[in-house]
Amino acid sequence: ASETAELVFQDCRVHKSQVLGKVGDGFIQAMKVLDGGRISIASLALGIAKGAYDASLKYSKECQQFGQPISSFQGISFKLADMATQIEAAELLTLQAAALKNNGEKCTKESAFAKYYASEISVKVSTEAVQIFGGYGYTKDFPVEKFYRDSKLCTIGEGTSEIQKMVIAREILK
């Protein structure tokens, strides 16, 4: 769950001595903060995806069908390969955005890339994890059901995936 609230400043007056920055620049300042927030959400999504992947990898090596671990079946091994590749790509995008931010460079496009891709693959990886676990993946006895639920929030917070696409499009079309 997340705590979400509406702030209303109707007929609100602020004394000159209490104004931070220049009057009218609040939106610009808020947008600058979003870059860092998007990197944070990308990191969160990446952690969820890694947790789902790690649990799936372990389970697929332990779970036996027809006298062999399910990881030996091509359908499962291909899922694991896709998951690992997507996680690696998301991590590189996230690290690139974080490095730019840490160096004080503009990172609007890169943070949107990272947030969009990492959050979307978090959902995909978590969904595949549930598939690998089968019916167990939907129960609270195993961790992947929580990864599955938690991953979706990452596609919403700090701007939905659709907003990230708008930001990316705006940046690449400049």
Positions of PLM-derived features:
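Fold-level recognition of mixed alpha/beta catalytic cores in primary-metabolism enzymes, strongest
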Residues: 1-3
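Alpha-helical interface subdomain recognition
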Residues: 6-12, 16, 22-25, 31-174
